[in-house]
Amino acid sequence: MHALGRIPTLTLLIFINIFVSGSSCTDENQTIQNDSSSSLTQVNTTMSVQMDKKALLCCFSSPLINAVLITWIIKHRHLPSCTIAYNLDKKTNETSCLGRNITWASTPDHSPELQISAVALQHEGTYTCEIVTPEGNLEKVYDLQVLVPPEVTYFPGKNRTAVCEAMAGKPAAQISWTPDGDCVTKSESHSNGTVTVRSTCHWEQNNVSVVSCLVSHSTGNQSLSIELSQGTMTTPRSLLTILYVKMALLVIILLNVGFAFFQKRNFART
């Protein structure tokens, strides 16, 4: 009977913690699981942070729980796993995450929050906070995803074309044009998980002189204006005009040459 009474208490504490801590920590796409057989309550959270920004990962508020041991288990995608733990009874702090810019946000006996001072691609992975209490264990799992803003470049091409490129973004950026043109977009994936997107567009209409490239990304959007190179279109009428001009120039040249020839001949006779 006592074991059954533990679970509702833990569930209530979790609900209060999510509501209160939402003002200081970013919680996205949370799911709560309650395992009555093992007295384990788990919260899963997906978190996206821009590269070079500070990340704050919340656990359960220790003042609300009679915690004994707080442990962060960190599993990076491209680095060995490491742990950061604090024993509240012994007041001891242990870590195997040295050199990764991952520390307690404050003193763990007051707040078990974890912070990453400057997020990098190597910090992607899962961060699990485990709190051991006499009433049961609490577990909060973060899936940390790093966002990388792309480097945007653009330039006009030949024959009324323009190129817009979003280099090394994560996730891949999306490129659109105004007005619409005849576009070809290609993507190139890199070994670090970033993607370069390159879009080349062509406009046949002579009345289009300036176009806009919109680069959409999770870290922010950029809109750029490009002035098209004023390449002339070779229509049949323009080809005929060019031909007539060339023929007229040729006739003039021949007349001048002939006139000079006869003048020289007449001069030689005299």
UniProtKB/Swiss-Prot annotation:
GO cellular component: external side of plasma membrane
Outcome after substituting residue 90 to T: Acquires binding to CD200
Lineage: superkingdom: Eukaryota
Location in or out of the cell: Membrane
Outcome after substituting residue 138 to F: Acquires binding to CD200
Keywords: Disulfide bond, Glycoprotein, Immunoglobulin domain, Membrane, Receptor, Repeat, Signal, Transmembrane, Transmembrane helix
Signal peptide (residue range): 1-25
Location of the Ig-like C2-type domain: 134-229
Distribution of this protein across tissues and organs: Highly expressed in monocytes, NK cells and a subset of NKT cells. Weakly expressed in granulocytes and B-cells (at protein level). Expressed in brain, lung, testis, thymus, intestine and uterus. Expressed in bone marrow derived-macrophage and dendritic cells and mast cells.
Its membrane topology: Single-pass type I membrane protein
Pfam families the UniProt entry points to: C2-set_2, V-set
Cytoplasmic side: 263-270
GO biological process: regulation of neuroinflammatory response
Molecular-function annotations in GO: signaling receptor activity
Family the entry assigns: Belongs to the CD200R family.
Binding partners and assembly: Interacts with TYROBP.
Function according to Swiss-Prot or TrEMBL: Involved in the recruitment or surface expression of the TYROBP receptor.
Protein name: Cell surface glycoprotein CD200 receptor 4
Lineage: Eukaryota, Metazoa, Chordata, Craniata, Vertebrata
Gene symbol of the encoding locus: Cd200r4
